[in-house]
Every structure is written in C-alpha cells, then in structure tokens.
Amino acid sequence: MANSILLFSFVLVLPFVCSVQFNISRFGSDVSEIAYQGDARANGAVELTNIDYTCRAGWATYGKQVPLWNPGTSKPSDFSTRFSFRIDTRNVGYGNYGHGFAFFLAPARIQLPPNSAGGFLGLFNGTNNQSSAFPLVYVEFDTFTNPEWDPLDVKSHVGINNNSLVSSNYTSWNATSHNQDIGRVLIFYDSARRNLSVSWTYDLTSDPLENSSLSYIIDLSKVLPSEVTIGFSATSGGVTEGNRLLSWEFSSSLELIDIKKSQNDKKGMIIGISVSGFVLLTFFITSLIVFLKRKQQKKKAEETENLTSINEDLERGAGPRKFTYKDLASAANNFADDRKLGEGGFGAVYRGYLNSLDMMVAIKKFAGGSKQGKREFVTEVKIISSLRHRNLVQLIGWCHEKDEFLMIYEFMPNGSLDAHLFGKKPHLAWHVRCKITLGLASALLYLHEEWEQCVVHRDIKASNVMLDSNFNAKLGDFGLARLMDHELGPQTTGLAGTFGYMAPEYISTGRASKESDVYSFGVVTLEIVTGRKSVDRRQGRVEPVTNLVEKMWDLYGKGEVITAIDEKLRIGGFDEKQAECLMIVGLWCAHPDVNTRPSIKQAIQVLNLEAPVPHLPTKMPVATYHVSSSNTTSVSSGGATVTFSSAQHGR
C-alpha cells in the first residue's frame, strides 16, 4: 500500500516538472493534463461538440501555460504539434452541417467566450465580432461558409488566422468527402523563418487533387504574450456536426512554466479528503499497470522474435561478425568513463581494444530499455552491414545479448568533425577541409546513386562525420537512415534529425528525400568553411540568433561572402577562389526551394571545377510546400525523433 501511495504521488507530481512535451493517445479520466470547458467531454476521445444538439461550443486546452518566446531575448520558440481528429457530417442530407474546429494559441487563463457558438468557432462573439478581445492565433478547419468573413470562392476551408475571423491565408477543403475518416495534422512553427505551417492527410480518403498544406509568415513574439494557452475549440450553429479529437502530441524548445488550474486544485482537494476515492484510484492505477505490463511483455516477445530473426540473418551473412558482450566489456574496460568517446540520445560510444583482431575499435552501446535505441540498432545494422565505401565508417561487428545492443566500428583517431570546427581539437588546414567536403560528398553520392538501393541518411551533421588518421571523412550513424527505391520521390518517414540541418520542406511535410540530405550537406559545407554552427545553443535553449544559411545568403547578396571565412584559416592561408566556390555550393545545396537544389553529383562537378559555379538569387528565396499524400509510399511511421545542434560528439 505504501508503494502504491508513493507511485500515486509521483503520478500527481510528474506533470508539473516535465518539459513542454507530451503525447496523449487516449483521453480518459486518468488524463489530468487537459482542461475542458463548454460542451467538451472526454470518453476515450474528446467530444468537442455533440452532434445531437445545435448552437454548442466546447474547448479542450492543455492545463499548463506554455512559453512561446523568451522575454529576455524576444526570441520565439520552435514548436510542433500533431493531432488526429474525426468530423461527423452525417446531417449533410438535411442541407448542411457546421461549423468546424480550430487549434489555437491565446493568452494564459482565458475562458470560453459566452455566445460564441456557430461561425464564431468558440473564439469570438457578437461583441468582439471579427476581431478578438485578446491576442489570438489559430488554425481553423472551417466547415461552414459565413459570408461576413469567410472566403466566398470555396465552400469550406482550412485557414491560418491572426487575431481575426478573416483568414490570413487559406485553401479549399471538403469535409464531406472525408466524413468519419481519421485526419492527421502536423502544425510546425519555424521561429528562424517566422513560418507557421500546417499539413494534413487522411487514412482512407486523401485526394491527390485536394490541397493539403498551408503556411503563413508571422512573428509570434510580436502577436502573442510570452506564455500562452494552447488547445482546441469547436462549435455547431443552426446546423449540427460532430467534432472528435482522437490524439494530441506537442513539443516545444522552451521549458515549461508551471501553473495550476483551479480545477486541478479541486481535484487535489477531493483526492486528499476522500480516502475511499484514493483507494479506488490506487486500485485503478494498479490494474492499469498490470494491464500495461502484460501488453508490454507481449510486445517484447514479438520484438524478441523479430530480433532473433535479424540475428540469424546476420550470422548467416558474410559481413560483420558477432561478438559476445563479455569480449566487448573486456575491450572497453567494463565501459569505464575514461574510455567514453562521446554520448548521444540513445547511448554512448567507447574506445576499446579487441585482442582477437589486434586493433582499436569504437563500441557503440545503446541505452538499456530504449525502444528507439532498439529500432536504431536494427536499422543501422541492417543498412550499414551491406555498405562498402571509403568514406563510410566501417562496421566491424555487433552484439545482441538480452537487452544489450552494441555495434563495433573502426576506430577514428581524429574524432568527429565538429570537435575540430567548434571544439578544442586542433583546427583544420584549408586543404584538409576541402578533402573532408569532397569525401562527405562522395559518401552521399554512393548512398544516393551508386548502391543498389537509395539510402537517405536523414541526420547528416558535423558530429556524424568522423575523421581517420589521415583526416579522411567517414560518414557514420545510420540509425535514422531509410532505404528507398531509386525511382521513387520523397517518402513519408516522420520527422527525425537535428534542427539546423533539416530542410524546410522536410520540416513542413515529414518527407525525407535525397534533396533533404543535400540540404544537410550544404549546411555542413558552410560550417566547414566558416567555422560557425548552423544554430547557436545557449543555456540549454535553441536560439537561432544568427541562422548560418540566412547570414551567408545575406553576405552573398552583398558580394561579401568571403568575409565569413573561418578566422583560423587566415593564419595558415587558404585559396580565396576555392573558398568562395565552396560557400556558394553550400548555399546552392541549402536552397529553400527543393526543386532548385542540385543533386549531389551536380554539386561534386562544381567542387571539382567540372561545371561553372551557379548564380543564385541575391536575396534568400522563401518557398512554400504542397503536401500530397497520393504519390508516395510510406516507409516508416511513428513519432518524431528530433535532436538539437550542439557541440556533443555524436547523437
């Protein structure tokens, strides 16, 4: 019983100390983070409006205020939110339905306005009419045309609205054709580009002729307060409609500021006073733990079967060999701290010496119990075990015993590229930087065009470029890589990678491609020449005070691109014409418009002086992206795996 009380207390405290990141796949009575107003109710999903009644409004909001921008620097936060929904338009047979729902950001502690049903979407009313009484930005899925403020050229629409019922940007959308289908939405705010984008798709009824993305340039730090409430609002008017929120995921790059909603306080009082209620809740939690544990055991058994199959395939192959955990622990002195080369999100890398091979190796040890780590282990072993190229880190062996997952690579005595560019290791001479750039490009050419399948790496960055004893570049870390057919276009993989290196269309659509890898290569090339990071990381927060691509493009427009050369190179000397060529190729590869980016082969031709240096626009273009789900084949699913650019070695 004491353990149950401790567990229950931990469950109560946990939401108030975590960062701004949550993932709710089911809305039940045990989900305390969500506050409901108006007609909104939770019964597994959130019923924002009841289809059996007219003139209704409902809110479901996150119960803590979310920091949107830093008051000290006025720099906004990147954020992304994913959610799934279902709209019931069954009453279309009676003439119409309405009015839709919206995801909104508004000041903290606001309440559902009175008399805000119908076309007001629960955000406005007759007194404030088309302008909100409080700062407000929202994305609306509007199913009913109100001629006073809605666009007249479409029946229903998806819009991005800035403090007004009139959409700042919109596109047509037909809710009838998607009746009862599950819609899945991604909303992303790129604070560096001030770009708020939304894209959506449907499980069964996606239409290739229908627009499915939208974006709007807005500086949220100029519109909204530093701390906001986020949530959903839906209404019905004289006609009815069912709006259900099925799941919700949110992630932000600023830390959470804790506030306690009054209704949470009341719940705490009730729990504290009612012993019987506490016992019931304890019983419920215990039952839930037992249920989840059994479910986890079943899933683990399936994973074990899958891993066993993979182990057998690897053991039959002629590639990397299998090692015992005992041998690897001995090689790395039981994985002592003084053997640690670097640490990332899913484990650490250690230096070791294998007596059986008489050689130094790097041992990547995945964190125990990490599901993502297991997936990365499987992905990396399956892909890299078949690859052979002088500019790829060579996989020597692997180990899977119980819950331990390890990979053994050739040892890179000169460490990672980022340690030389941004860390304390000796700086790199100009001819070495040129060799590294061409080596990385050669590795990418092999992955994209020369191997039997196209490999999209998805996490090309300076910390994943290793340097051997002769400072040859070796691309590593294939845990996020995906295999694709050469003839297919961008594939839906889910957002993964590192902010600062991810292409804008990849952030907006979640579709990885050879072009998104080329963008990352362009950013790394600019880092190599300038010695500057793609984004700055200060006090644990990502603050793109100077976005490298934007700054370099500005200098290019002024004809001053060469002034950005790494100051360390001015001591040992460099080829100015060659440096300018590398910078322009870097910008070309990091072009915001995916259709204007070169292939890696074209970039290599310019770097080798086999083709002329391209002429780029003097001002950095702003591209928008159309998301169509009809022409792609999904190769992966699941949540986002995103890290932030830093000076750490590896992921």
Curated annotation (Swiss-Prot):
Keyword ATP-binding (UniProt): yes
A single GO molecular function term of this UniProt record: protein serine kinase activity
Record-given protein name: L-type lectin-domain containing receptor kinase IX.1
Keyword Ribonucleoprotein included in the entry's annotation: no
Record field: transmembrane: 270-290
Membrane topology (Cytoplasmic): 291-651
Reactions listed under catalytic activity: L-seryl-[protein] + ATP = O-phospho-L-seryl-[protein] + ADP + H(+); L-threonyl-[protein] + ATP = O-phospho-L-threonyl-[protein] + ADP + H(+)
Record domain Protein kinase: where: 335-616
Location(s) in or outside the cell: Cell membrane
Gene Ontology terms: biological process: defense response to oomycetes; plant-type hypersensitive response
Family as reported in the entry's similarity comment: In the C-terminal section; belongs to the protein kinase superfamily. Ser/Thr protein kinase family.
Subunit-structure text: Interacts with ABCG40.
Any Pfam family: Pkinase
Topology in membrane: Single-pass type I membrane protein
Extracellular side stretches: 20-269
Knockout consequences: Increased susceptibility to the oomycetes Phytophthora brassicae and Phytophthora capsici associated with reduced expression of some defense genes (e.g. PR1, PDF1.2, CYP71B15 and CYP81F2). However, normal defense responses to the fungal pathogen Alternaria brassicicola and to the bacterial pathogen Pseudomonas syringae. Susceptibility to P.brassicae and P.capsici is enhanced in plants impaired in LECRK91 and LECRK92.
UniProt superkingdom: Eukaryota
Keywords in alphabetical order: ATP-binding, Cell membrane, Glycoprotein, Kinase, Lectin, Membrane, Nucleotide-binding, Plant defense, Receptor, Serine/threonine-protein kinase, Signal, Transferase, Transmembrane, Transmembrane helix
Binding site residues for ATP: L341, G342, E343, G344, G345, F346, G347, A348, V349, K364
Additional remark text: Both lectin domain and kinase activity are required for resistance to oomycetes, but only the lectin domain is required to trigger cell death.
Active site: D459
Gene responsible for this protein: LECRK91
Organism the protein comes from: Arabidopsis thaliana
